[in-house]
């Protein structure tokens, strides 16, 4: 490394930025494949039940399944409207 290289800004090349973004997309897609088949239907049914009591839109309910070595966790996030 020369003296002048020390003061130059180190910019990420567009190729490395594109590679990093692609890795994020691939990881996200792999995560989607591991979800159970019943998850979309479960989300719709939960949405119907919640709508009996509160007016919400489809994007206000999120259902995810997290897995680790010993168990699976069903995570339900509902954004309730303000009154």
From Swiss-Prot:
Keyword terms, alphabetized: Cell cycle, Cell division
InterPro entries, A to Z: MinE (IPR005527), MinE_sf (IPR036707)
UniProt keyword NADP, yes or no: no
Pfam families the record matches: MinE (PF03776)
Keyword Cell division (UniProt): yes
One BP term from GO: regulation of division septum assembly
Family that this chain belongs to: Belongs to the MinE family.
Role, per record: Prevents the cell division inhibition by proteins MinC and MinD at internal division sites while permitting inhibition at polar sites. This ensures cell division at the proper site by restricting the formation of a division septum at the midpoint of the long axis of the cell.
Name of protein: Cell division topological specificity factor
The organism of origin for this protein: Marinobacter nauticus (strain ATCC 700491 / DSM 11845 / VT8) (Marinobacter aquaeolei)
